[in-house]
């Protein structure tokens, strides 16, 4: 039987449109993932409850990581790769941006603030969290606000927005603080717990996470006037619009379905590993607004 040329052409076009995406049509991160069959997720080791190592060696858990896994599922569907392999790559505050830039990590979801300076180096997904920058201290230290830190040892984590803010405050107000920059949040809290610092400046949600894993959580308090409000986002390589589109849709679909509320409650209002403690950190009005109206803007651009 002969098929009319016009019908044959129509059939060919239809077949092409319905065919799975092939690597030759892809660019950037999606092409890399399609060709290797692997996606590499950047994660933290101690950013409780966002991204941190659980009981299974080398495998992260946390609020941000759960959203990162939603991206993995979206990529599987987009590329028709049901057997997509997931590789985990540990990052720190200092290495997270370079490892995204050089292709070692395809996407980093942890506790990374989206700001204008970082936007020059990487692209950010729509926001996944909003925090205020505050202080963690021992209740007996009687640290009520930042003015109480004059002449004292204060710790923060190297390579973070908090480190930059604390150093600027120290210089501008001539507070005479001795600022200790620890390699990660776990080390920052160790400095605080051991008495080498009287306060730990960081994002409030992370401070609650550190407090939850303390030997005696009730000995500690989060306080101080927030010095900044910041939005966390997942980092991807700059200019990779196709991959960012998949990432953003995976996150906003999780928001629209309401599943984000279950994920939030799992990590902020219920017992979490490693000690089964509850952060008792209800969702803020700022985060509710961010979920209702997602944006990839930094807080200072709002």
UniProtKB/Swiss-Prot annotation:
Q: Identify the keywords attached in UniProt to this record, alphabetized.
A: Amino-acid transport, Periplasm, Signal, Transport
Put simply, this protein is called L-glutamate/L-aspartate-binding protein
Q: Which terms under GO biological process does the entry name?
A: amino acid transport; D-amino acid transport
Role of this protein: Binds L-glutamate and L-aspartate.
Family from the record:
Belongs to the bacterial solute-binding protein 3 family.
Q: Which organism is it from?
A: Pseudomonas aeruginosa (strain ATCC 15692 / DSM 22644 / CIP 104116 / JCM 14847 / LMG 12228 / 1C / PRS 101 / PAO1)
The primary site where this protein sits is periplasm
NCBIfam families (UniProt xref): PRK10797.1
